[in-house]
Amino acid sequence: TVSLAAVNTLPVVTDTTPTTAWTEASGTGANTPVVVDSGVTVTDADNTTLASATVSITGGLQPAEDVLAFTSNSSTMGNIAGSYNSTTGVLTLTSSGATATLAQWQAALRSVTYNDTSHNPNTASRTISFVANDGTLSSVASTKTVSITAVDTLPTMTDTGSTTSWT
């Protein structure tokens, strides 16, 4: 007699290029977020849905500056919702009832952005790790580097229009 038992396999998250570049805005305008990896893929040999995923700043975290976010779009991402913890640098994505499909998870992970809110950013690179969970097992982390480029902003002086006198 031969007995076969099903074995749950890990989901797999695969990133594309190893580095994404972020550059500080020139002047005093707001910095622009960059997509961390627009080509990231998610697979799972024995599941068509996943329960959750985390995207974490696992290297170089600057809690007062760094922000991870994602664009929630129910037509392409189902019921995936997210929350970011700035202290830990972790963006947690969840699917109520673990019903979001692999394609929906892939769309959500592809929409994750990094931004630095400082106009004097720490220029150390950030390591961003993607992990998917099928409800039982978590994938091995897939990591990306975000390089940080600061821009020297010219000082500004404002003329108040008043006359200055000296006595």
List the model feature ranges, each with a label:
Residues T1-T167:
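Extracellular glycosylation-rich, acidic/polar low-complexity regions of adhesion-
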